């Protein structure tokens, strides 16, 4: 693909270069093909697009502001830093952008039951939210480890009428929850719509989720033009599966002047093996219906990912990111737990904004880069979610470090 066609993928088989595809059980194939057909039709349907725009505006609260972070900029003493304020959306993160799109599709297809997987709980909450709004049954699969560290979100899902099913398999995190959701889907093919929360899974999910999230990047283009009269020089976003990043990046892929940086979770450090950086520390393989970079051992078994942030500890990454990494269009770096925590505290103190620990990974990368850039360099960081859900984790870490000092 030439530079001018970077936004055209995937091909008809759902491939971005060597990544993506449809690796699913035979029973699911008709459903997947049906979903792809319905999505292609919906994309061209003015009524569908009109309804989507209505809910984005009046229910989600879009457009989200592009905010000049004056104090962060002063602190870094270099690039001019803008925050794309996705944490101000209804439910507190970017996840709702995709959920609104998919729930409208589910309704269009006559589905009565929604299932989803969740890690940090934000996608679970957003799914339960839209299911409540459209009066559909909702079942959320969530690993027991994540349930423990995200109790407030579990309670929110139940308040919204969803059934939360604990997954004890594996490490009881996102990968295991996704496995269970896929099993459920195979069993309940006719009535059920699987609302995947990230740019992973079998085709058409990676492209569909990206398209619903691309509202982030489209707004950013317009807002930056309005505020600065030109495009940004660089974009920074954190990456778990990669939907908030893809939403910001995709509308800029063909703009050669825009540098794009994705930030993975390095956990305790890439060299320790305790991390969630699939591109910086993984190899290609197949998981959850698509071929992408994965954390694997020498026998090809999936290794458990680690991150302080429940939303980043996925052992894979969206196939489009794998491809963009492969062709060198996007630079993928990583940030440790400690670096993310430090950035979290800086953002709280300097801007009065409590970011999600996921978003704090992107901020940490900004703190590394911005001081070395000229003052007219325009940098946009995707503030993908708010940190309310992370209070327990941060409190726990602060107590731990206090104890270690004594």
Swiss-Prot record:
GO cellular component: cytoplasm
Keyword check for Amino-acid biosynthesis: yes
Protein name per the record: Tryptophan synthase beta chain
Gene label: trpB
The organism of origin for this protein: Pseudomonas fluorescens (strain ATCC BAA-477 / NRRL B-23932 / Pf-5)
Pathway assignment: Amino-acid biosynthesis; L-tryptophan biosynthesis; L-tryptophan from chorismate: step 5/5
TM spans (from-to): none
Catalysed reactions, as listed in the record: (1S,2R)-1-C-(indol-3-yl)glycerol 3-phosphate + L-serine = D-glyceraldehyde 3-phosphate + L-tryptophan + H2O
GO MF term (any one): tryptophan synthase activity
Annotated family: Belongs to the TrpB family.
InterPro entries linked: Trp_synth_b_CS, Trp_synth_beta, Trp_synth_beta/beta-like, TrpB-like_PALP, TrpB-like_PALP_sf
Function: The beta subunit is responsible for the synthesis of L-tryptophan from indole and L-serine.
Keywords: Amino-acid biosynthesis, Aromatic amino acid biosynthesis, Lyase, Pyridoxal phosphate, Tryptophan biosynthesis
Cofactor(s) the protein requires to work: pyridoxal 5'-phosphate
